[in-house]
Amino acid sequence: MAKQKFERTKPHVNVGTIGHVDHGKTTLTAAITSVLAGKGLATKRDYNQIDGAPEEKARGITINASHVEYETVNRHYAHVDCPGHADYVKNMITGAAQMDGAILVVSAADGPMPQTREHILLSRQVGVPKLVVFLNKADLVDDEELLDLVEMEVRELLSEYDFPGDDIPVIKGSALGALEGKPEWVAKVEELMDAVDAYIDTPLRATDKPFMMPVEDVFTITGRGTVATGRVDRGIVKVGDQVEIVGITDTKTTTVTGVEMFRKLLDQAEAGDNIGALLRGVDREGVERGQVLSKPGTVKPHAKFTAQIYVLSKEEGGRHTAFFSNYRPQFYFRTTDITGIITLGEGTEMVMPGDNAEVTVELIHPIALEEGTKFSIREGGRTVASGSVVKILAD
């Protein structure tokens, strides 16, 4: 049978491996590519290719991450694997690699460890919707009861962080065994990918979500009106659509009377397009950078929220000293800086460079916010921390 030509007709899903250091995340990533390559669905990547992760920058923070891609019969996957623990923390908080789901790797020989817990917590905080568990190194555990005990421990830990611990698929296997081509362990990696296929939901395509566009610039066209420019974050906007202008000032409703891209007029624009939207009855002062245009009723302005933040270390160009409650930096959301006040959680005296922490933030004026919205914290124009909105609080 001729090999099928690669077509982008399959739904695309972003996943990643998470878990404690040395529990086998990278070996499993290599094993997945190796097993799927045997079916003509991936290019085999060996451990060293994945482990030598290149540096990338996201929101002014350097992160090491390896990206591999592969397919199952049903889907096309992009898979991210990070070499160091700090890279995971940064990756998840900055959203450098959005994950629609993750494979939690736990060594059956060691059971859950501190970073296992931390990665589950981070997944919960930054909104990774679904986890699948791979109990690795099962070939090193002779006692079946011990394996069951570790599985129970992992399930309890997941439930502790509000994941459905009883329902999450747990596959016991050996990544190294699969990489070496041993049939019983190859079968376990196949079982894992079946679970990932079935349990991790296909994300809504960006174009199927309600329209939103952060405003980057505003200008006036004489005789025609005010144009707001920016990149459509999600959804579709058509000429004649009503939109709301949200954030900074009171929410206003207007109608899009024209959509322009590369100086050409369009009937509609969709997620990813850089456009200018002509707004009816809005003067030059009626819309500004930092606001968003959105489908009416879908986005609300908020000023107060809890957030998970990662504070850059001195070596990363961050602060040299700790900060305390009532710290007042600038919060950079989408296109604009806005001052806010940080309050630390009970029992936390201070936050040191290199830490990650949960904090409460109150902005000086409300802006369009949702759970999962990413932001940077800046001081004098340089990034000192990165964060993700965990929960909106009543103002």
Swiss-Prot record:
<keyword id="KW-0342">GTP-binding</keyword>
<feature type="binding site">
    <location>
        <begin position="19"/>
        <end position="26"/>
    </location>
    <ligand>
        <name>GTP</name>
    </ligand>
</feature>
<dbReference type="InterPro" id="IPR027417">
    <property type="entry name" value="P-loop_NTPase"/>
</dbReference>
<protein>
    <recommendedName>
        <fullName>Elongation factor Tu</fullName>
        <ecNumber>3.6.5.3</ecNumber>
    </recommendedName>
</protein>
<feature type="region of interest" description="G2">
    <location>
        <begin position="60"/>
        <end position="64"/>
    </location>
</feature>
<comment type="subunit">
    <text>Monomer.</text>
</comment>
<dbReference type="GO" id="GO:0005829">
    <property type="term" value="C:cytosol"/>
</dbReference>
<dbReference type="InterPro" id="IPR009001">
    <property type="entry name" value="Transl_elong_EF1A/Init_IF2_C"/>
</dbReference>
<comment type="function">
    <text>GTP hydrolase that promotes the GTP-dependent binding of aminoacyl-tRNA to the A-site of ribosomes during protein biosynthesis.</text>
</comment>
<feature type="region of interest" description="G3">
    <location>
        <begin position="81"/>
        <end position="84"/>
    </location>
</feature>
<feature type="binding site">
    <location>
        <position position="26"/>
    </location>
    <ligand>
        <name>Mg(2+)</name>
    </ligand>
</feature>
<dbReference type="InterPro" id="IPR031157">
    <property type="entry name" value="G_TR_CS"/>
</dbReference>
<dbReference type="GO" id="GO:0005525">
    <property type="term" value="F:GTP binding"/>
</dbReference>
<dbReference type="InterPro" id="IPR004161">
    <property type="entry name" value="EFTu-like_2"/>
</dbReference>
<keyword id="KW-0479">Metal-binding</keyword>
<dbReference type="InterPro" id="IPR009000">
    <property type="entry name" value="Transl_B-barrel_sf"/>
</dbReference>
<dbReference type="InterPro" id="IPR004541">
    <property type="entry name" value="Transl_elong_EFTu/EF1A_bac/org"/>
</dbReference>
<dbReference type="InterPro" id="IPR050055">
    <property type="entry name" value="EF-Tu_GTPase"/>
</dbReference>
<dbReference type="InterPro" id="IPR000795">
    <property type="entry name" value="T_Tr_GTP-bd_dom"/>
</dbReference>
<keyword id="KW-0378">Hydrolase</keyword>
<dbReference type="Pfam" id="PF00009">
    <property type="entry name" value="GTP_EFTU"/>
</dbReference>
<keyword id="KW-0251">Elongation factor</keyword>
<dbReference type="Pfam" id="PF03143">
    <property type="entry name" value="GTP_EFTU_D3"/>
</dbReference>
<keyword id="KW-0963">Cytoplasm</keyword>
<keyword id="KW-0460">Magnesium</keyword>
<feature type="binding site">
    <location>
        <begin position="81"/>
        <end position="85"/>
    </location>
    <ligand>
        <name>GTP</name>
    </ligand>
</feature>
<dbReference type="Pfam" id="PF03144">
    <property type="entry name" value="GTP_EFTU_D2"/>
</dbReference>
<feature type="domain" description="tr-type G">
    <location>
        <begin position="10"/>
        <end position="204"/>
    </location>
</feature>
<keyword id="KW-0648">Protein biosynthesis</keyword>
<dbReference type="GO" id="GO:0003746">
    <property type="term" value="F:translation elongation factor activity"/>
</dbReference>
<dbReference type="GO" id="GO:0003924">
    <property type="term" value="F:GTPase activity"/>
</dbReference>
<feature type="region of interest" description="G1">
    <location>
        <begin position="19"/>
        <end position="26"/>
    </location>
</feature>
<feature type="region of interest" description="G5">
    <location>
        <begin position="174"/>
        <end position="176"/>
    </location>
</feature>
<dbReference type="InterPro" id="IPR004160">
    <property type="entry name" value="Transl_elong_EFTu/EF1A_C"/>
</dbReference>
<comment type="similarity">
    <text>Belongs to the TRAFAC class translation factor GTPase superfamily. Classic translation factor GTPase family. EF-Tu/EF-1A subfamily.</text>
</comment>
<dbReference type="InterPro" id="IPR041709">
    <property type="entry name" value="EF-Tu_GTP-bd"/>
</dbReference>
<keyword id="KW-0547">Nucleotide-binding</keyword>
<dbReference type="InterPro" id="IPR033720">
    <property type="entry name" value="EFTU_2"/>
</dbReference>
<feature type="region of interest" description="G4">
    <location>
        <begin position="136"/>
        <end position="139"/>
    </location>
</feature>
<dbReference type="InterPro" id="IPR005225">
    <property type="entry name" value="Small_GTP-bd"/>
</dbReference>
<feature type="binding site">
    <location>
        <begin position="136"/>
        <end position="139"/>
    </location>
    <ligand>
        <name>GTP</name>
    </ligand>
</feature>
